[in-house]
Structure formats: structure tokens, C-alpha cells
């Protein structure tokens, strides 16, 4: 039986359009995998970090799971190094700096956080 939200989807990072997110120095890019129309509850996608450092206060709960390389995050006076097979959970409101050299996937809740915070 098909879900009312549509079919199951297989998503390959190589098929997505990555958008600049940070750098220079370095480079950072993200690619949202599903639109808010398909999934307003969960935002999912991939990111590539190549030495850029991006400061941000997250407006959502976030999970980051590393596929290749080493992702780094500075938050709460801690420095986290996340390698393939590991993941981070980051609660809403965390002030942080993303960094490192990695390909990683992410999940955010709510997926439509920009709309909820008046940023769209």
C-alpha cells in the first residue's frame, strides 16, 4: 500500500544540486534532498565540508551522520570530531561552528524551520 505522503525514495548525494554555505577560506555546500511539500516534518540532505568554518545557532534539532572524512563541530566549549559510522545529535538553540573535511548526511526537525522562523 502506498503512503499518503508518496512512495519510498532512494536519494543519492551525487544526484543533488549543492548550494554554497560557507568559505572561503575552505568551502562548504549543502543539498536538501526533499522539499517541504514532500516532508515538512523532517528536513534531510547531504553536505560537503572542505575546511570552511561556519558559525550558526541552530533553529531546529539536528542529526549529522558522517559518510566520508572527519566532520568537526565546536559547541558548548567542546570540540567534537565525528568520523564515518558516528553521528551527532544537536539540540535546537545550540551555538556552534561547523568545520572539518567531510561528506555527511543530516536530518533536521522541523523540516520547515525557515517558514516557522519567518525566514522564507
What is each PLM-predicted segment?
Residues 48-49, 57-75:
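Short, conserved beta-strand element in jelly-roll/cupin
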Residues 63, 70-72, 79, 95, ...:
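Structural motif
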Amino acid at each position: 500500500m502506498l503512503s499518503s505522503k508518496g512512495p519510498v525514495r532512494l536519494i543519492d548525494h551525487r544526484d543533488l544540486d549543492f548550494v554554497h554555505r560557507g568559505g572561503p577560506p575552505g568551502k562548504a555546500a549543502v543539498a536538501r534532498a526533499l522539499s517541504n511539500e514532500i516532508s515538512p516534518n523532517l528536513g534531510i540532505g547531504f553536505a560537503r565540508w572542505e575546511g570552511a568554518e561556519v558559525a550558526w545557532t541552530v533553529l531546529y534539532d539536528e542529526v549529522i551522520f558522517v559518510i566520508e572524512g572527519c566532520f568537526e563541530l565546536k559547541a558548548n566549549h567542546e570540540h567534537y570530531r565525528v568520523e564515518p559510522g558516528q553521528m551527532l545529535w544537536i539540540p535546537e538553540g545550540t551555538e556552534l561552528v561547523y568545520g572539518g573535511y567531510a561528506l555527511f548526511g543530516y536530518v533536521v526537525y522541523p523540516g520547515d524551520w525557515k517558514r516557522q522562523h519567518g525566514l522564507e
